[in-house]
Every structure is written in structure tokens, then in C-alpha cells.
Amino acid sequence: MSRKARDPIVLPQGVEVSIQNDEISVKGPKGSLTQVLAKEVEIAVKGNEVFVSPAAHIIDRPGRMQGLYWALIANMVKGVHLGFEKRLEMIGVGFRASVQGSFLDLSIGVSHPTKMPIPTGLEVSVEKNTLISIKGINKQLVGEFAACVRAKRPPEPYKGKGIRYENEYVRRKAGKAAKTGKK
């Protein structure tokens, strides 16, 4: 059983949670999110707190889904209240990014420009041509799109060129040593 899931999720002011059938929906100032619930968990809303507990009819490992749904609901609450943001930085000569309509256009040292469609529900902005900011209310969608952008040109260990998360540490390797010895 998850230790964190024993505590209730406290709802900030302006956030509402409703449960209908097997679906939970969270509404807040930034938008609304829904999640289908598994039969292994029971959700109870009391005042401004949400409680996640294992279902009574589950005999085999009753708390295995409790922590998962606690985290999913907590992320939904945080997303509709504050939102999520991932920032990526591009390091390399000639590396640039720009937003054109619903596409993120990347110039990352290949012969053709790379265009990535921006998923609905995300807001992408580019600062100083090399700093990409991805914002949204769905933590999974923000992280997944940021990972897809990073995967187009991950940082390489010798010169550090590529796309990396802001403040990400890239372990550097020493280059090949010069050949010494007999001529």
C-alpha cells in the first residue's frame, strides 16, 4: 500500500472534483481534466479533501492501485490549479526553434527542418531562439511532448550539443587521446 496515498488530497480554492460512474473529473481555473477509474480503488470527496482507498471487494493485494490513482488525481488537481511547465534548451551552432501556427519548427543540424505538430492542450513558446517552453494542465502530455522534442537531438557526451532539459546535467566524456609512441 502506498504511504503517500494514506493522506488526503487537499483541494485548493477554485478546484472542484466530481465523480460519475467510473470517471473522475477535476475542474479549475486553468481548465478541466478527466480520468477513468479502475475497479480496484474507491474515491471519496469530503469537503475540500479527496480520499483514495482500495476497493472493499479486492482480496489479492488490495492497495496496489491506490498510490497510482492518488498520484494521478493529485497531478490533475495541481494541473488545473497551477499548470505544468517543461523547459528545454538547445545547445549547438545554428540550432534554432520557432513556433509556426500549430507546429514547432526545429533547426537542429540536419539537412531538412524538423516540424513537430503541437498537441492540443499545450502551449509552446520559444525565447531567444534556443529556449523552448512547454506549458499545459496535463502533466503526462507536457512530459511526453518534451521527451519527443528532446529525442530529436539528445545531448551528446563529447561536446554537449543537442536538446536538453533546462538544468539537466550531461555527463561529458574525454575525447580520444593523441597517438604517442614510435614513428
Swiss-Prot record:
Entry's Gene Ontology molecular function annotations: rRNA binding; structural constituent of ribosome
Keyword Ribosomal protein tagged: yes
UniProt KW DNA-binding keyword: no
Keywords: Ribonucleoprotein, Ribosomal protein, RNA-binding, rRNA-binding
Function according to Swiss-Prot or TrEMBL: This protein binds to the 23S rRNA, and is important in its secondary structure. It is located near the subunit interface in the base of the L7/L12 stalk, and near the tRNA binding site of the peptidyltransferase center.
PANTHER family assigned to the protein according to its UniProt record, in alphabetical order: 60S/50S RIBOSOMAL PROTEIN L6/L9 (PTHR11655), LARGE RIBOSOMAL SUBUNIT PROTEIN UL6M (PTHR11655:SF14)
Annotated protein name in UniProt: Large ribosomal subunit protein uL6
Lineage of producing organism: Bacteria, Pseudomonadati, Chlamydiota, Chlamydiia, Chlamydiales
